[in-house]
């Protein structure tokens, strides 16, 4: 039976950094040195060939200027004496041949004496017969040779012959090959030096990269990016100069910032971020700044900034932040659940007391009074709780309203749910949290406005229609002054004194974030009425 292996075992890992760098540098070095070798060898070959040709030409010119050669050309080939002079020079300079001819190409000298007096072999002498020096490669009687030709002139500057000198081509090739080996050894030495330098470079790179391989760095980077983009908190990192080096999607959304292609190194955001969040103290002293409330573009953010250290040195700072309205939304959602639990606890105590009354009446056998008591209790439950649960399908909202009804009763006031109210359950947590925040603020404001004098009345109406929830909260309190009603949703504006006026501003922000609206009407001394409209996924979640 074949057993499957984990993916990380089956996956073929890339080559190590050291292997990759050594192979790449070796390939580059080999390619470069090969090209250099070919070019240099070609130049060396040409230079060697030209050097030997120039040396032969120098010997040929010397012979052409020799008086003995000029005088010998005035005689017959066998009587000229040129053969002895040419052979002496040939042997001294290790040449293949030295041939002196007259203008009819008849030889006056040759390494093989029997060929003296015979015509020169090869048409490469023609240019020299016409008065031009010439260099050619050709085969004569002796071997393939590099041959140079120089014209001979008499005292009247009249051409009287030609000096031809030959260098054995194998000798030329041998000198070129000797030069090639020096080039090859130089190339190999360069390769060795390059490989040693590459090994040193790899060690330095590994130290800089903390011993990690490139694929490991890539994996860590991808994991970091996935982690940063998956968390809901905004994250902004800065370097030791306060320049923003990293910002995740949540931070961009909270700051209403989108990086464009023209923003290099987030310079635009760096400037605005340094004006909002002062990280200089964190970068200077390494002192964390925790739970700061900062307003950025009409958003109240809760920010924590901590230093980033490397080997004990501060190299930057990281700020994490979250919209405080989100935090408050979670707190209010939790508060709604706590209220629901408290309401159930109060009801359980109340029903326990009623069960004790029923048990007592049974022991006393007061059946008529027991019947009346049970009917009264059932009617009260139907009126108070059963009616509310029949209208409000969301257990969280129902528990929240029950707790507020009990709180109003404890304060001596009455909180009633309009008989026409209807609220389907919703699958959206944001909508439930926003409704709890809204009703909680409006009911608490109404209770505070009614004051300690009992007898006040608060009415709540919830009406759902075509995907929208319409809420009304009325109270018969003192109302809102005309000069404040237009600014009642502004931050800091309150009818309760200084250092208040945050709740309604947050309510308005949350409602509008959902795409809803909120309005108010008030008649001083008579009533205050708030109108709220928010989207509600009641139909979808109740199908």
From Swiss-Prot:
Residues 42-181 are periplasmic. It comes from the Bacteria. Residues 212-323 form the PAS domain. PROSITE patterns: HIS_KIN (PS50109), PAS (PS50112). It is found in: Cell inner membrane. InterPro entries: HATPase_C_sf, His_kinase_dom, PAS, PAS-like_dom_sf, PAS_fold, sCache_3, Sensor-like_sf, Sig_transdc_His_kin-like_C. GO terms for molecular function: ATP binding; phosphorelay sensor kinase activity. Residues 346-538 form the Histidine kinase domain. The modification Phosphohistidine is found at residue 349. Its EC number is 2.7.13.3. The keyword Transmembrane applies. Residues 1-20, 203-543 are cytoplasmic. Autophosphorylated. The phosphoryl group is rapidly transferred to DcuR. Keywords: ATP-binding, Cell inner membrane, Cell membrane, Kinase, Membrane, Nucleotide-binding, Phosphoprotein, Transferase, Transmembrane, Transmembrane helix, Two-component regulatory system. The keyword Cell inner membrane applies. It catalyses: ATP + protein L-histidine = ADP + protein N-phospho-L-histidine. GO terms for biological process: regulation of DNA-templated transcription. Homodimer. Member of the two-component regulatory system DcuR/DcuS. Involved in the C4-dicarboxylate-stimulated regulation of the genes encoding the anaerobic fumarate respiratory system (frdABCD; nuoAN; dcuB; sdhCDAB; etc.). Weakly regulates the aerobic C4-dicarboxylate transporter dctA. Activates DcuR by phosphorylation. The periplasmic domain is involved in C4-dicarboxylate binding and sensing. The structural disorder in the cytoplasmic PAS domain has an important role in signal transduction to the kinase domain and may be the decisive structural feature that characterizes the activated kinase. This is Sensor histidine kinase DcuS. It comes from Shigella flexneri. The lineage of its organism: Bacteria, Pseudomonadati, Pseudomonadota, Gammaproteobacteria, Enterobacterales.
């Amino acid at each position: 039976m074949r057993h499957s292996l984990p993916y990380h075992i089956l996956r073929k890992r890339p080559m190590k950094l050291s292997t990759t760098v050594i192979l790449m540098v070796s390939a580059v070095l080999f390619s470069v040195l090969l090209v250099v070798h070919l070019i240099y060898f070609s130049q060396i070959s040409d230079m060697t060939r030209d050097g030997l040709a120039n040396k032969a030409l120098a010997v040929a010119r010397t012979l052409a200027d020799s008086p003995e050669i000029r005088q010998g050309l005035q005689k017959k080939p066998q009587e000229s004496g040129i053969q002895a002079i040419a052979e002496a020079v040939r042997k001294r300079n290790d040449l293949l041949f030295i041939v002196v001819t007259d203008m009819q190409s008849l030889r006056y000298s040759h390494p093989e004496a029997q060929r003296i007096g015979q015509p020169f072999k090869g048409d490469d002498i023609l240019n020299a017969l016409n008065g031009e020096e010439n260099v050619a490669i050709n085969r004569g009687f002796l071997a393939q040779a590099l041959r140079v030709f120089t014209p001979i002139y008499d005292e009247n500057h009249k051409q009287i012959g030609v000096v031809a000198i030959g260098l054995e081509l194998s000798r030329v090739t041998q000198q070129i090959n000797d030069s090639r080996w020096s080039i090859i050894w130089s190339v190999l030495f360069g390769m060795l030096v390059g490989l040693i330098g590459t090994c040193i470079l790899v060690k330095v790179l590994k130290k800089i990269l903390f011993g990690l391989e490139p694929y490991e760095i890539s994996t860590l980077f991808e994991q970091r990016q996935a982690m940063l983009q998956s968390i809901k908190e905004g994250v902004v990192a800065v370097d030791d100069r306060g320049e923003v080096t990293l910002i995740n999607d949540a931070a961009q959304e909270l700051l209403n910032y989108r990086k464009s292609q023209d923003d290099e190194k987030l310079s635009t955001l760096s400037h605005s971020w340094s004006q909002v969040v002062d990280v200089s103290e964190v970068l200077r002293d390494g002192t964390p700044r925790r739970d700061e409330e900062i307003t950025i573009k009409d958003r109240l953010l809760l920010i924590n900034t901590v230093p980033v250290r490397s080997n004990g040195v501060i190299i930057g700072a990281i700020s994490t932040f979250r919209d405080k309205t989100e935090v408050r939304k979670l707190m209010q959602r939790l508060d709604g659940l706590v209220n629901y639990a408290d309401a159930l606890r109060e009801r359980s105590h109340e029903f326990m007391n009623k069960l004790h009354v029923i048990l007592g009446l049974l022991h006393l056998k007061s059946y008529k009074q027991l019947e009346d008591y049970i009917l009264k209790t059932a009617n009260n439950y139907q009126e108070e709780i059963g009616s509310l649960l029949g209208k409000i399908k969301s257990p969280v909202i129902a528990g929240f309203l029950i707790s507020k009804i009990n709180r109003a009763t404890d304060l001596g006031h009455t909180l009633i749910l309009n008989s026409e109210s209807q609220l389907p359950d919703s699958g959206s947590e944001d909508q439930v949290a926003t409704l709890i925040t809204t009703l909680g603020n409006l009911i608490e404001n109404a209770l505070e406005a009614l004051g300690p004098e009992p007898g006040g009345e608060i009415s709540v109406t919830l009406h759902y229609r075509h995907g929208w929830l319409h809420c009304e909260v009325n109270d018969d309190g003192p109302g809102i002054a005309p000069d404040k009603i237009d600014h009642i949703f502004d931050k800091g504006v309150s009818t309760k004194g200084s250092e208040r006026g945050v709740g309604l501003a947050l309510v308005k922000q949350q409602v509008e974030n959902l795409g809803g609206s909120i309005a108010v009407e008030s008649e001083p001394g008579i009533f205050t009425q708030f109108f709220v409209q928010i989207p509600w996924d009641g139909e979808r979640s109740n199908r």
